[in-house]
């Protein structure tokens, strides 16, 4: 079982949980405040970060995509969590796309630094 240790998962609060879709997951194990979760396959919009501290620019680029900055001008619902992969030489921010979409249904991003990726089922460590 692969565990993605370098992924920081930013979890939404209770108020967002009622209005924002989250990927389905099952709890595998809890170790103190850390949960090992098995997530199903998803699609992510991703953008590189200039550094591991540049999350606001990445968030703006991804928000631009879901708020109509795409080849159809279509708005896409916000989901949770927002992900940051904090590998020093290649940090990335990602938004999970709503489950109603397939890769064929999603409009292409207008911003060349935003790309779409199929993410297979995976195990993630999350701070609960």
Listing of model-derived features with the role each one plays in the protein:
Residues 3-12:
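Sec-dependent N-terminal signal peptides
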């Amino acid at each position: 079982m692969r565990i993605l240790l370098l992924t920081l998962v930013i979890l939404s609060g209770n108020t967002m949980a009622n209005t924002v879709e989250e990927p389905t997951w099952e709890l595998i194990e809890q170790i103190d405040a850390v949960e090992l979760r098995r997530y199903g396959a998803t699609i992510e919009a991703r953008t590189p970060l200039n550094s591991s501290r540049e999350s606001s620019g990445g968030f703006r680029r991804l928000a631009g995509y879901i708020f109509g900055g795409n080849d159809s001008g279509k708005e896409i619902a916000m989901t949770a969590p927002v992900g940051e992969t904090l590998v020093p030489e290649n940090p990335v921010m990602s938004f999970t796309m709503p489950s109603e979409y397939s890769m064929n249904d999603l409009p292409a991003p207008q911003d060349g630094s935003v790309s779409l990726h199929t993410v297979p089922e995976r195990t993630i460590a999350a701070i609960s």
